[in-house]
């Protein structure tokens, strides 16, 4: 149940999105105890992103805990303007995601949980496909794993002892 919600003015200019809320249950001697799990993504729109997954008895508490966790787990992503530097594939669990850069004006061509991650990180032009499971938790994990694996040409050239012009041909 991918419920998407934007909360403006959250912290230091961060964008927060609620990706999914699930009802979970714990079976005890007296019956079932119900709780909620919230999955959120947080980004600054300029190459930083994090996700949070938390449980609580009430939905608002689960969302709040998840947002706090997402803010603590933020990572830097190397972007090429409003798109990616190169195609990348990543996996988490049974979710495999493939992302590739797109030209200006293409937009975000991605589904569900991947779209929320791209919107908060600041990517506006990307082609993406999720293969395998569409479980939002694993899709978000795989997407962030792929984005953090991106390398800009400057750092790759420095690591290889070349100039950027030599690297790009």
From Swiss-Prot:
Coiled coil: none annotated. The keyword Ribosomal protein applies. InterPro entries: Ribosomal_Su5_D2-typ_SF (IPR020568), Ribosomal_uS5 (IPR000851), Ribosomal_uS5_bac-type (IPR005712), Ribosomal_uS5_C (IPR005324), Ribosomal_uS5_N (IPR013810), Ribosomal_uS5_N_CS (IPR018192), Ribsml_uS5_D2-typ_fold_subgr (IPR014721). One of its GO terms (biological process) is translation. Keywords: Ribonucleoprotein, Ribosomal protein, RNA-binding, rRNA-binding. Residues 14-77 form the S5 DRBM domain. SUPFAM superfamilies: dsRNA-binding domain-like (SSF54768), Ribosomal protein S5 domain 2-like (SSF54211). The keyword Glycosyltransferase does not apply. Signal peptide: none annotated. GO terms for molecular function: rRNA binding; structural constituent of ribosome. GO terms for cellular component: small ribosomal subunit. Pfam families: Ribosomal_S5 (PF00333), Ribosomal_S5_C (PF03719). PANTHER family: MITOCHONDRIAL RIBOSOMAL PROTEIN S5. The N-terminal domain interacts with the head of the 30S subunit; the C-terminal domain interacts with the body and contacts protein S4. The interaction surface between S4 and S5 is involved in control of translational fidelity. Part of the 30S ribosomal subunit. Contacts proteins S4 and S8. With S4 and S12 plays an important role in translational accuracy. Located at the back of the 30S subunit body where it stabilizes the conformation of the head with respect to the body. Belongs to the universal ribosomal protein uS5 family. This is Small ribosomal subunit protein uS5. The lineage of its organism: Bacteria, Pseudomonadati, Pseudomonadota, Gammaproteobacteria, Methylococcales. The gene is rpsE.
């Amino acid at each position: 149940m991918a419920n998407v919600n934007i909360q403006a003015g959250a912290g230091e200019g961060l964008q927060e999105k609620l990706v999914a809320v699930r009802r979970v249950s714990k079976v005890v001697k007296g019956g079932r105890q119900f709780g909620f799990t919230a999955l959120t993504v947080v980004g600054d729109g300029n190459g930083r992103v994090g996700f949070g997954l938390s449980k609580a008895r009430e939905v608002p508490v689960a969302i709040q805990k998840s947002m706090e966790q997402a803010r603590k787990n933020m990572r830097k992503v190397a972007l090429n303007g409003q798109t990616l530097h190169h195609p990348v594939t990543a996996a988490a669990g049974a979710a495999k995601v493939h992302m590739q850069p797109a030209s200006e004006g293409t937009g975000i061509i991605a589904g569900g949980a991947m779209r929320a991650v791209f919107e908060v990180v600041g990517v506006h032009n990307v082609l993406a496909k999720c293969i395998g499971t569409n479980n939002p938790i694993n899709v978000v994990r795989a997407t962030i794993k792929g984005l953090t694996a991106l390398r800009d040409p400057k750092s790759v050239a420095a690591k290889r002892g070349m100039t950027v012009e030599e690297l790009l041909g």
